Amino acid sequence: MKEWTREEKYRYLKDPQELVGLYDRIRGSRYRQTFHNQAVTGLMNDPNGFVWFDNRWHLFYQWCPWGAVHGLKHWYHIVSKDLVTWKNLGVCLLPDQEEGYDNKGVYSGSAMPIGDKIYLYYTGNHRDPDWIRHAYTCLARLGNDGWPEKYPLPLFGAHPDYTENQRDPKIICGVEEGTYYMLIGAETKEKHGCVLVYKSEDLQHGWHFEGELSVPGFEAFGNMWECPSIERIGGKDVLIFCPQHLSIPGRGGSQNHNGYIMGTMDWKTLTFTPDGQFHVLDFGFDSYAAACANNIEDADKAVLIAWMGVPDVSYPTDEEDWAGCLTLPRELTVRGRRLIQQPLPELKKLREEKVELRPNEFGACKLPEAAELELDCRAGHVRVHLFTDERGEGGLEIRYNDVKREITVDRSGLKTQFNLQEGTERTRPLENGLQHLRIFIDRSSVEIFVNDGDAVFTSRVFPQETEHHFRMEGDLFPRLWTLKPAVKEEFLI
């Protein structure tokens, strides 16, 4: 594994031609995705600034161009008309050099479309000459011409009553006429995660600190709360956030989680009253920093995209100097006291050819590199083995225990192992049993939707050349489609 110096990690991008050789090298990787957004070069992580504007979906992501390292972050810009096929527009926000408020990174944030502009709110990561970090909440404005204009001064700096871990501004409108709120992920001096609330009557000026969000029962729930958001979905308030350094049953050794709490938000008292426990958004191995779209034209359409990765983890493609992709977009609804995540109906447009299943002498079928597998599960125990060899052995296993009524995803059978410190299994109880699985398979990922979105398992996988079969056990009715590419592989900086 390459050891990066500080100078290498925080090198400024001066000319796109500096990246041509790296792009030419990584584009031939066997693990480059076909229908998922991924880093053009280097590393991508959090999705940012997800909005509907000018008849297109706009999405940005955290991008470090030089390699698979969390170094100097930029905002890279992509667009889509249907949330299925995507086009690269290139880098949008770059760090200012030397003394700028974001001189060591344009960190995560959100966006709000107003008139003919998109307002981009982000955390400016500033380092002084002694390498002490200072966080600033900054603003840029993007017009139809595609050129961003940064505001010369930040909206505000870090609040002194909290640690320097203050970032990920989420802009919220529609609470009160003519008023905007902003949520900031933060951490108390006692190292407890929290959310700070700011308010303004003007998107561009006059932001003032309202206070810390009260969430009764969650006063000491992990450390820093990253990527906070309060969404109104199906008439319910939902607090979505990423608590760090927290152990949760069924999550193996993972210490970083993405989840939500259902409840009621009172903006006057800054109190979010929970209506239950913390729920994990995605039970798989690799999902974090989920972002919901700001869509002021259709507030009832809640769409979520997340980073298909987790902090502090190395992936096999790190050796190729690239890492990271985004999940498929998911539509959010409420069922009872739970969020339901389902693949967007538009994703059916990716279906290319329905595959006739022809098991070989070992009961294994060929598994296309890009595919959708749908299974009706009629009764009893179920086992689905993906990415096996031609004998149906090894691979990633999905197993349902009908006695315990729980589903488990186990990737210990894959030949390429990584992140073993966080375990190789993830388990989720299913109160009503297993009825349905819908599985999206790309060259280096698998997304498993259980019972029409009651649970989701998202994981990176890196199958070797011999791991391109699958095998099923149980009373199942399967359908398999190949999927066509949805993201054009192109060098655009």
Which ranges hold each PLM region?
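Beta-rich carbohydrate-recognition and catalytic domains
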Residues: 1-168, 173-221, 232-283, 297-301, ...
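Repeated scaffold domains used in trafficking and secretory/extracellular systems
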Residues: 288-290
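Secretory/extracellular carbohydrate-interaction modules
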Residues: 353-413
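Short, solvent-exposed beta-strand-to-loop segments that form ligand-recognition rims
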Residues: 453-468
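Beta-strand-rich interaction surfaces with strong enrichment in secreted/lumenal proteins
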Residues: 277-280, 361-365, 424-430, 459
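Short, aromatic/His-centered strand-loop micro-motif at the edge of beta-sheets
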Residues: 415-436
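Short tryptophan-centered beta-strand motifs in secreted/extracellular beta-sheet-rich domains
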Residues: 373-375, 433-450
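Ligand-recognition surfaces built from glycine- and aromatic
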Residues: 260-264, 465-493
